[in-house]
Structure formats: C-alpha cells, structure tokens
Amino acid sequence: MTIKSMTEYETISYKTFLDIFSPLPEIGEILEESESVEEAREKLFEFCKELEWEIRMGRIKFDNEVDRWLALKAIEVFLNIISKDNERLAGFSTLEYLWKAYKGDEEALKEIREGFIEEFRHLFLAMSGKADYSLGFLGKRLLEEGVKFIDFSKIKGREAGIARSNFLDKVYEIMREYISRYPSGLDKRIILKRKKNREILEEFFGITDEEWFNYKWQFKNVLRGLKGVKILRELREVTNFKISDEDLEIIEKAVKNGIPFGLTPYYLHLFDFENPYVEDLAVRRQVIPPEWYVEKMIEHKEDRNIAFDFMGEHDTSPIDLVTRRYVTIAIIKPYESCPQICVYCQRNWMVQDFDAKAFPGWEKVEKALDWFAEHDSMIEILITGGDPFSLSDKAIEKMLNRIAEMNHVVGVRFGTRTIVTAPMRITDELAELLGSFEKSLMISTHVESCYEITPEVAEAVKKLRTNNIYIYNQHVFHRYVSRRFENVALRIALKKVGIIPYYTFYPKGKMEHKDYLVPIARLAQEVKEEARLLPGSFRTDEPIFNVPRMGKNHLRAWQDRELIAIKPNGSRVYLMHPWEKGIYPTKLYTYEDVPIKEYLDSLKEIGENIEEYKTIWYYY
C-alpha cells in the first residue's frame, strides 16, 4: 500500500468545500457573515449551544435515539474543535481554515485535502441527526436480505425468543462470511500448502525434518544481511517461491545501509510461495519493509537511537538494560535482537543483527538484575528485548535463579515472538525449566494474524500450558491486519490453541512506520462493531495507545482522549490522557493521527469495499 505524497493531491474546489455545510447551512452562514475568526467562534458557540438545547428539550425529532445521542456527541466534538484553548494545545486553528476557505481564500483551499472535507461532512451530518448511524454497518444488508429487526414491544415470550435467536443466526451468517476471508494456519488447505513449502526449503537447504524442527538450526540459518537476500533470490530462481523485484531491492538496500533484517526459515515457509501478497500479505509485511521505512531509517542513520525512540526509553532508563514507566513493574532487556525482526518494532532504534553481539554481556545483565533486587517496588519483572528466548536455556535459568532470590518479586513475564517465528524453540526442556520456577511466570507474545497460528504454534503452547504457563497475546493493530473481522478471526484462532487475548495495541505513531498506521477511530470501531459479537472470554484484549515516556493508555472513552482539532490534511489531533491522571500531577499528550480518508484509500487499493467501514467517521 503506497501513501500519496502531498504533491499528488488535487486542490479541493470551492464548490466541493461548500457542499459539506448542506446538513447544517447555518454554520456556513455564520462563517460567511463573520468579519473575523473570533466573531465566527462566538457565533458558532451560541449556535451549537442552542442546537444542543433544542435537542435536549425534545424539539428536534430523531428516528432513533442512537442518532440523538450521536448528534449531542458530535456537537461536543465541534465545540472542542473551535475551542480557543484547544487551538493553543494543537498549535493551530481548524476554525481559521474553515473560515478562510468559506471566504474563498485560495491558499486555505490549496492546503485542504479530501480527508478534511470528509471529516466535516460526516461531523455535520452527525450534528444534524442525518448520519444514519443508528442503522449500523450491517443494518442495510439485513434489510436487503429481508431480515426483520425484533421489536420486543410487539412480541413476547417464546415467540420473541425464537425470533431473536433466528435474527442473531442471520447476523452470525454475515459474521462468518467475513471471518472466512482470513484463512487460519490450522486450516487443512494451509497445512498442506506449508508442508510442501517445508519440503521445498528442506531440499533447498539440504536438511532433514530433524534439523528443520531443531531451533538451533533455525537460529543458525536466519536469513539476514546480504547472504539472506542472496538466498531469497536463489529460492526464486530454483523453486516456486515468488517475491517481487521491488521487495528484494528494498531488503538489499536496507541491509546495505545497516538496517537489521531477519527472517527464520520457519517463518519463510508461512509465505504463500505461488500466490503471494494475497492471503500472506500480513505475514510478508511483518518482515519485508516498505520503501518509506527504509528511506527514513537511512535518513537518520547517525541519530537513529534518538530519532526513533518514540517511547522515550532514553529518558526512562535508570540503568543500562532497564526501562521503567510504571510503579510496580519494569523491563529488563538481556538480548538486543530477535531471530526475526518485525518492521513495526518500537525498538527498531536499538535492535541489532541476530548474532552474539546482541548480548550485552553478563556484567551489564547482572547489574540490571541487582537494580531489581534493590527496588522492592518491583513486584513483577518483564524480561524482553529483543527476544530473550534467543538466549540459551542456561542463560535463562541463570537469570531466573537470581530473580528467585528476590523476595519482593511476585512474578516474571517473558516477552517473546519465538512462539510464532520459531515455535520449535519451545522445547520440552525449556517448558519444564520455566514451569519449575517457584514464582508466578507468564509469557506475552505477538501473534498478528490467524495465518500465523499453525500446528507448530499449537504444540509449543501445549508444552507451556502443560507446565502451568499461560500465554497472553499483545496484538499490534497495524494497517495490514486491520480489515473487517480480521482481528476477530485472530481471536478465534488464538483461543483454539490456548493463547489468551491480552492487549490490542495502536501501533506506535512513529514517522518511519507511516505505512503501518491506522486511525484510532478504526481500533475503536473494531472493538465496538466486531469484537463485541464474540463471547466475552474471546475479547479479553484491551485497546491500548502508548504515550511516550508514560506508557499504556486505554482507548475506552473520552476520559482517555479528546479530539481537539482536524488538520487540513484530515489528520485528527487528540489530547491523550495518561494513566497517571487522577493519581498525581501529570501532563497530557498531543497526538496527530493518520487521516481516516488516507487509511480507507489504502484499504480500497487492496480490494476492500470501504462502504463496509462507513461508520468509522463517528468514532471520536
């Protein structure tokens, strides 16, 4: 998915701009008659409060109370956007663009993009009660298929129960249709396809099944550097493996410029060799970087550790290898690489090539562990990296033995993706070692799509669960795994193998990850319109936005964020409320989101019907 550059956009016509005011022409009239932005602000405030009062007094009628609720919420959003104080926080005035553009100011019209137009078109529809949000994204289709909505005021008892059950069956039929778009690695068709892929790779590398299923062979033969590029080229030449010239060139450019690239042979066999970039799109985009990412990493080659440290770990590390953002838990990073390097990694600024140099040495690790021993506030330790399961069993045991001596530590959590990228790393010996630890121990992983869930993953999870170790999933909700019901398909696959949905992360808003970002509204939409259709035990994941230096911020409601501005390109500007609010003094964080229009365009490019996402505009 390629995002347009600013120069590729066409200037919005004045007529197109004026059309957005048709649901509420009074707003346009106020802008036209106002001699200044401040005059417009005051008159718009008065208009909005009068409109709100008319709604609250019941003088404006709505077909559905949901549309009434949305109108009031949209008015609140508009008042937020025209607020003088919010302009100070955002660093610019959305109202000024509206006012100037309505006056026909050519410079303002040149800056305004379709995303801006669409935001206000939908906002004014919502304020006027004409958004038709109450029909829902499935309502139109259900009506077209002759499905009747249940009115419990008209039918009662068993008749109502049967009617409701039949209605919900129809909803599930549509839900199942969506889910079927995303094959799981547990599907027989996919299992057979990957068996053939494995056989092809075994023949190519000249190895047996025994070697393939040995994690040490997998680690030793990670495709990295120019040698890895050469292997991919040779595979394309002598087997049925397909990869585009563009991707090969981008990978080569990355490694030549010192950008770490790593791909385990196991994860490579998850690719669709013969029909690439369709069912395996998410898998490929996990490891194959887009051009924008590579260019940005090269641009900041000398200051990468500062430019891309989105979470401000330099400011939250009391000692080498330790990061602390919370009261009772901190991170230790004993290995600074992974057998497979994910493009969207938040620690791309510190991740090294997968080799011995990524281990910082026992002296540093022991000093970091001493820090935990000295701080009795640390009741849990998160061992992450990089990937700590890149280390030997002996190294892992050595760290656990040291932690076992710390009476104040209640539990340990390992953060690893080897369960997905090299599941053979979870040997009986490692599982038993972890299970023998006398304190509470759990594992968090990153499964990104149901296509990654395989029989090998299921076997790895089984070994851990047999030793009373629970595995939790932290899903990064990036652009390539954000289609309708894609995360629902993932949750179902996770539950099948015994992994518990834990967090769904908004991807870190890092400039180099532009091609992976989604609007916050899409995550909110997914939770409300898709995840909600699953049983509660399947949707145990919390939607999360990470605030730099402060950490996880829930995306539940307006107590967590405020929409305070819309930029000319259609980007929403949010004021994020950190978890510390209400506990002690803290500062709020201003974040510029990816434009919804830009995101929808990217979905359209891969064949999605963006009409299916039309309610996204109403998640503020």
UniProtKB/Swiss-Prot annotation:
<dbReference type="GO" id="GO:0051539">
    <property type="term" value="F:4 iron, 4 sulfur cluster binding"/>
</dbReference>
<comment type="similarity">
    <text>Belongs to the radical SAM superfamily. KamA family.</text>
</comment>
<feature type="binding site">
    <location>
        <position position="342"/>
    </location>
    <ligand>
        <name>[4Fe-4S] cluster</name>
    </ligand>
</feature>
<dbReference type="InterPro" id="IPR013785">
    <property type="entry name" value="Aldolase_TIM"/>
</dbReference>
<dbReference type="GO" id="GO:0046872">
    <property type="term" value="F:metal ion binding"/>
</dbReference>
<keyword id="KW-0663">Pyridoxal phosphate</keyword>
<feature type="modified residue" description="N6-(pyridoxal phosphate)lysine">
    <location>
        <position position="552"/>
    </location>
</feature>
<keyword id="KW-0408">Iron</keyword>
<feature type="domain" description="Radical SAM core">
    <location>
        <begin position="324"/>
        <end position="586"/>
    </location>
</feature>
<keyword id="KW-0411">Iron-sulfur</keyword>
<feature type="binding site">
    <location>
        <position position="338"/>
    </location>
    <ligand>
        <name>[4Fe-4S] cluster</name>
    </ligand>
</feature>
<keyword id="KW-0004">4Fe-4S</keyword>
<dbReference type="GO" id="GO:0003824">
    <property type="term" value="F:catalytic activity"/>
</dbReference>
<protein>
    <recommendedName>
        <fullName>Uncharacterized KamA family protein MJ0634</fullName>
    </recommendedName>
</protein>
<dbReference type="InterPro" id="IPR007197">
    <property type="entry name" value="rSAM"/>
</dbReference>
<feature type="binding site">
    <location>
        <position position="345"/>
    </location>
    <ligand>
        <name>[4Fe-4S] cluster</name>
    </ligand>
</feature>
<keyword id="KW-0949">S-adenosyl-L-methionine</keyword>
<keyword id="KW-0479">Metal-binding</keyword>
<dbReference type="Pfam" id="PF04055">
    <property type="entry name" value="Radical_SAM"/>
</dbReference>
<dbReference type="InterPro" id="IPR003739">
    <property type="entry name" value="Lys_aminomutase/Glu_NH3_mut"/>
</dbReference>
